Structure formats: structure tokens, C-alpha cells
A protein has these predicted regions:
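A polyanion-binding, active-site-adjacent surface
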Residues: 1-198, 212
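Glycine-biased, low-complexity coil/linker segments
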Residues: 206-207
């Protein structure tokens, strides 16, 4: 299946009850040969209205992070979600909804063949890395699966950070660049400057925690 066929089929999806309440299917956004894949939980209100992932305040925050490490959803990365339709009232996707939607993400994964997968939030990490993944115990760690580096959320997804009205001085977000050789620590604070110091590193070993 190619990208065009996959997207057309996904936009017509009726595999779960979310199809009855959605405005738009949020298929994903990015380049078809991206080495870095970001996976979120699911669309929010703004995403449901526009049909694109991470376009509200959380999207603006995420774009700051991407810009700081030379990533751009229009040029060299891809953004998708576990579920393609917005759960009502932005609740967590039900297990049945996630399971019904995962084949779409698996096909995107197969077409992309990314080198690095960054999970944006607990639910994404538990679906992509391991069902018992613990953000508290395993945040910011790289884990290798079948030659692909998976990274769990370092603190919380951008949608949570964007809703904060007070600064978040301590938590940081680790993202890895497209060449797999540079990482940057960016404050999880929407008011912070996106410019940050780049740190050259080697590929992390299995389970290695990257620290400043």
C-alpha cells in the first residue's frame, strides 16, 4: 500500500465509535522519508477542526522544540498519533479505540521505516514501546527494538505543557536530531527561548539515559 492509498482509506475509516463524533480524521503530517517519527496520543479540538496533528498551542510548543534541533514537519520528520480521531472531551483513547486504529500507524511506520521514534506522552509510549512503560521510572531513555531507537517521553506531552500558566523550570525534553548524532535539552516552558545548546553525542546504547 502506498501513501496516497493509505491516507484515502484512513480518511474513510469507521472501525470504531470515534468516527461518529469526529470532524476530521487526523492522518498525520510530514515527509514520506523521515528518519524521525513523533507519535502522540490523539487529536485535540484544534487538530480535529483542521485535520492536522499538533496545530493548537501544543503544536506551537512542539514546533519550537523541533526548530531548535533543525527539525521541521514540512522538511525532515513525521508526526502521527495513536488514534486518528479525537476522543470526546479529550479523554484518553479507550483500549478498543487504540487497537482499532493501530493498523493505520503500523502502515505509516512500514512506509516511513524511521530510525528514531519519539513518543509524546504515556499512552504513546505504552503502545509503541511496552505496555507497562513507566514515565516516572523510564523517562528520557532510548530503547532499541529491531534496530530502531525508541524514546519515551521525558516529562509530559506538549499538550500538557502548553496548558500550564506558570513556568516549568526543571523538566526538560530530549529530542534527537536527524543525523542521530546530536541531542538538545529544551526547557519544557512555552515562554523559553527555542535556541539551545547542541550537544554532540554518539548513538545511545540500549536503555541509556541521556543527561546534560
Amino acid at each position: 500500500m502506498d501513501w496516497e492509498t493509505l491516507k484515502a482509506d484512513c480518511l474513510a475509516c469507521s472501525r470504531c465509535e470515534l468516527c461518529k463524533t469526529r470532524t476530521n480524521v487526523v492522518f498525520g503530517q510530514g515527509v514520506p522519508d523521515a528518519e524521525v517519527l513523533f507519535v502522540g496520543e490523539g487529536p485535540g479540538q484544534s487538530e480535529d477542526e483542521q485535520g492536522l496533528p499538533f496545530v493548537g498551542r501544543s503544536g506551537q510548543l512542539l514546533d519550537k522544540y523541533l526548530f531548535a534541533i533543525d527539525l521541521d514537519r514540512e522538511k525532515n520528520c513525521y508526526i502521527a498519533n495513536i488514534v486518528k480521531c479525537r476522543p470526546p472531551q479529550n479523554r484518553d483513547p479507550l483500549p478498543a479505540e487504540s487497537e482499532a486504529c493501530m493498523p493505520w500507524l503500523r502502515e505509516q511506520f512500514r512506509l516511513l521505516r524511521p530510525k528514531i521514534v519519539v513518543c509524546l506522552g504515556r499512552i504513546a509510549a505504552q503502545r509503541m514501546i511496552r505496555s507497562d512503560f513507566s514515565v516516572t521510572k523510564e523517562h528520557g531513555q532510548f530503547m532499541e527494538k529491531n534496530g530502531i531507537l525508541f524514546m519515551g517521553p521525558s516529562t509530559r506531552p506538549p499538550c500538557c505543557a502548553a496548558r500550564r500558566t506558570s513556568p516549568m523550570p526543571l523538566p526538560t525534553l530530549w529530542l534527537c536530531g536527524t543525523r542521530s548524532t546530536k541531542c538538545v535539552s529544551i526547557p519544557m516552558n512555552e515562554s523559553s527561548s527555542p535556541s539551545a545548546h547542541f550537544v554532540r553525542i554518539h548513538l545511545p546504547r540500549r536503555g541509556e539515559v541521556l543527561a546534560a
